[in-house]
């Protein structure tokens, strides 16, 4: 289970603000078959108000649609840095999954 990280320099209205996408996909095998769960987060980053780096905590709870109702906590901490070009550079710092 690894998050995919990407960046962009325009939002839907075409402004020059940078934004970061964090997408996390996990695959679970249940008696009913394989289930793929994808969660995503979009975080806008304004280079004018951005001081060096920013940390995004991304922890969705996911309940599998099976009889046991097992809940997975998928936690992903992502740090972004603004490069000279004004785009955020993202790198993963921690990813974990807890079963509760």
From Swiss-Prot:
The keyword Mitochondrion applies. Its main location: mitochondrion. Keywords: Mitochondrion. The keyword Mitochondrion applies. It is found in: Mitochondrion. One of its GO terms (cellular component) is mitochondrion. A stretch of 270 kb of the mitochondrial genome is duplicated within the centromere of chromosome 2 resulting in the duplication of the gene. The expression of the duplicated gene (At2g07697) is not demonstrated. This is Uncharacterized mitochondrial protein AtMg01240. It comes from Arabidopsis thaliana.
């Amino acid at each position: 289970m690894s998050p995919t990280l990407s960046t962009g320099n325009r939002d839907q209205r075409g402004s020059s603000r940078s934004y970061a996408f964090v997408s996390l996909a996990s695959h679970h095998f249940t008696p009913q078959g394989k289930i793929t769960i994808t969660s995503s987060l979009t975080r806008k980053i304004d280079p004018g108000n951005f001081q060096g780096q920013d940390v995004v905590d991304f922890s969705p709870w996911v309940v599998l649609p099976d009889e046991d109702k097992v809940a997975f906590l998928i936690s992903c901490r992502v740090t972004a840095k603004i490069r000279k070009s004004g785009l955020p550079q993202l790198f993963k710092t921690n990813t974990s999954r807890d079963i509760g």
